[in-house]
């Protein structure tokens, strides 16, 4: 293929591709995902293929005469691993069609985060004998120092190492070469406050130091084993910068962030998964309301070159309500690219398939912008409304634009409006009756716009009727 296509395969980035016409042939060049994504791009250019939702795929149909495009293009994603934000698009087929690939995690129990207990230290197995050494004082987290007992710490680390090997053998044994294993603390629980953990926090200013000191030796041994057992393959061990362990162990020296010492520099095969749980997601990370979280990310980038990012785009206190992160997606994804983020999960309504039309819009934008953060945002919106809402495009676009305008008004007139993913903003004061009635009018207009289709095309009518809400 190198000679016939004239393409140097070694120059194609990971997940990238080149599509090139040579005489009467079209070569789609790349490896693994790259070939797949190149094939979908070929379909896009040749047959107007575009996926907008699970049940809405645009494609030129009943074509009888088609001239082959003269291809000479190359592309690769700005963010290497792009996880779908909403549940209905998480299947392998949907991810492939949207050029997403969040299925990078190896797990036996299906719990790919907050899994330090389930995946590595199940209480049913260890708590009766190791309760006072391996678990935090309240039993809700691990103790990453084993109460300062070096022998017990070594046993804990070896337990993690052996578990990592088991998971790799399980997946690689069936030719499923995924690239990450999460070793992440439990959710909504304080970190250990034993004397040894407290001393680590006192010295480094963060609970994260104990986690780094725990995992770095494991990562070194794991890399040696992986190189010997599966040469040419790489697997990240991923730890959280989250809640009580969100702060990075750095200091300021000559006006620059630097590691507090060399022991907290994270090994190359350890991914640092930053999840700014308390950030304001009605504003982008460059807004003054998120200065703390942007600075925290900068600090972590000093001690890790292997960054993962978890953001939020849903209201988890009112799951069915609008949560207007549309204005921040492009900006935040550009930030992720600029930080060389390896994996992005923009957490939406991940555990349900009952999505609204605007959830699907977020999923579409999530896919397009995480591949190309500089994509034309306005054009993406236009394409989605035209193809997804069809005859109801105009009233649904008015509804969408008016809602976003109202949210901008709320943010401009109420500086204390909370924007965390678990904040409650859905009050009569913020959304008065006359505003809601205006939006209901747009919805009624949308139903009227599709009414003629009821007799002409009942199948499409029913589909569109369900999308209007």
Where are these regions (language model features)?
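Aromatic-lined carbohydrate-recognition surfaces of secreted/lumenal glycan-active proteins
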Residues: 215-251, 307-314, 344-347
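Feature activates predominantly on carbohydrate-active enzymes
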Residues: 12-223, 231, 298-322
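Catalytic domains of carbohydrate-active enzymes that cleave complex glycans
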Residues: 368-469
């Amino acid at each position: 293929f190198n000679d016939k296509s004239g393409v140097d395969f070694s120059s194609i980035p990971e997940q990238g591709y080149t599509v090139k016409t040579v005489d009467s042939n079209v070569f789609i060049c790349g490896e693994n995902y790259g070939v797949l994504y190149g094939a979908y791009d070929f379909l896009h250019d040749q047959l107007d293929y575009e996926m907008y939702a699970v049940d809405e795929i645009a494609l030129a149909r009943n074509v009888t005469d088609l001239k082959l495009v003269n291809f000479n293009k190359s592309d690769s994603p700005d963010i290497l691993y792009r996880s779908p934000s909403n549940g209905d698009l998480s299947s392998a087929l949907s991810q492939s069609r949207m050029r997403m690939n969040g299925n990078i995690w190896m797990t036996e129990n299906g719990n790919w985060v907050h899994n330090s207990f389930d995946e590595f230290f199940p209480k049913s197995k260890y708590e009766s004998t190791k309760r006072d050494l391996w678990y935090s004082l309240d039993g809700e987290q691990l103790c990453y120092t084993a109460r300062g007992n070096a022998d017990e710490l070594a046993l804990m680390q070896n337990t993690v190492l052996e578990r990592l090997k088991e998971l790799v053998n399980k997946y690689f044994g069936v030719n499923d070469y995924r690239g990450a294993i999460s070793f992440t603390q439990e959710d909504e629980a304080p970190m250990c406050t034993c004397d040894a953990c407290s001393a680590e926090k006192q010295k480094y200013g963060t609970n994260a130091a104990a986690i780094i000191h725990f995992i770095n030796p494991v990562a070194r041994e794991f890399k040696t084993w992986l190189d010997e057992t599966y040469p040419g393959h790489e697997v990240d061990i991923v730890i959280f910068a989250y809640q009580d362990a969100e702060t990075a162990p750095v200091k300021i020296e000559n006006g620059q962030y630097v590691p507090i010492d060399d022991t907290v520099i994270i090994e190359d095969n350890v991914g640092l998964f930053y999840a700014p749980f308390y950030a304001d997601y009605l504003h982008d990370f460059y807004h003054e309301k998120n200065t703390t979280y942007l600075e925290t990310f900068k600090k972590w980038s000093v001690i890790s070159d292997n960054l993962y990012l978890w953001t939020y785009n849903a209201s988890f206190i009112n799951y069915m309500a609008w949560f207007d992160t549309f204005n921040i997606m492009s900006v935040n994804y550009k930030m992720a690219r600029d930080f060389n983020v390896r994996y992005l999960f923009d957490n939406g309504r991940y555990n349900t398939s009952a999505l609204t039309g605007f959830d699907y819009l977020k999923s579409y934008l999530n896919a397009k912008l995480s591949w190309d953060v500089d994509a034309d945002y306005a054009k993406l919106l236009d394409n989605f409304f035209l193809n997804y809402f069809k005859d109801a495009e105009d009233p649904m676009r008015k509804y969408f634009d008016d809602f976003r305008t109202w949210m901008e008004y709320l943010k401009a007139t109420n500086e204390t409006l909370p924007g965390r993913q678990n904040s409650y903003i859905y009050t009569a004061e913020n959304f008065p009756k006359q505003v809601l009635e205006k939006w209901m009018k747009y919805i009624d207009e949308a139903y009227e716009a599709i009414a003629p289709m009821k007799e002409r095309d009942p199948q499409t009518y029913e589909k569109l009727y369900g999308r209007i809400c």
